[in-house]
């Protein structure tokens, strides 16, 4: 199990003005593990190898040497899977995790590229909301779906 303080491999990619990609893999530290309870112990997910992921959680496919963010739903079929919890992470440097040969966007990532950009998940706003939970400093936050609030467009905008 991944926990606060664990060292993980993170990934960063930037595209310069000439369209060239600059990539780096570095070691980062897990700041917090976010565990969201699946309703009725099931969730709609896409299976990519051994990775089960929600259909719209941005990834980069390292298996096929891709450089652009995409949604898992473009790579596989979404279906209901039995699962008790979904896990998301906050890294100390806010960089993306490497999981099962996929790059996995973390909360507060600050990325502005197409697909991965998000006004809440990609900013410190989500980190600030998570820090309000008394267990954040211990390295974990347990959520239920009713703690996740959406705006008028259906996008997640607050957790409390």
Q: Predicted regions span which residues?
A:
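HINT/intein-family self-processing domains that catalyze protein splicing or autoproteolytic maturation
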Residues: 1-160
């Amino acid at each position: 199990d991944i926990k606060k303080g664990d060292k993980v491999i993170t990934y960063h990619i930037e595209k310069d003005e000439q369209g060239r990609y600059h990539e780096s893999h570095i070691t980062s530290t897990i700041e917090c593990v976010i565990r969201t309870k699946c309703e009725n112990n099931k969730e709609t997910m896409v299976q990519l190898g051994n990775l089960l992921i929600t259909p719209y959680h941005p990834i980069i496919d390292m298996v096929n040497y891709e450089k652009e963010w995409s949604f898992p739903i473009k790579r596989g079929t979404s279906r209901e899977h039995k699962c008790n919890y979904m896990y998301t992470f906050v890294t100390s440097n806010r960089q993306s995790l490497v999981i099962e040969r996929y790059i996995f966007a973390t909360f507060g990532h600050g990325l502005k590229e197409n697909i991965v950009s998000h006004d809440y998940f990609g900013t410190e706003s989500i980190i600030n909301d998570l820090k309000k939970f008394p267990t954040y400093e211990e390295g974990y936050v347990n959520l239920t779906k009713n703690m996740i609030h959406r705006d008028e467009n259906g996008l997640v905008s607050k957790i409390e």
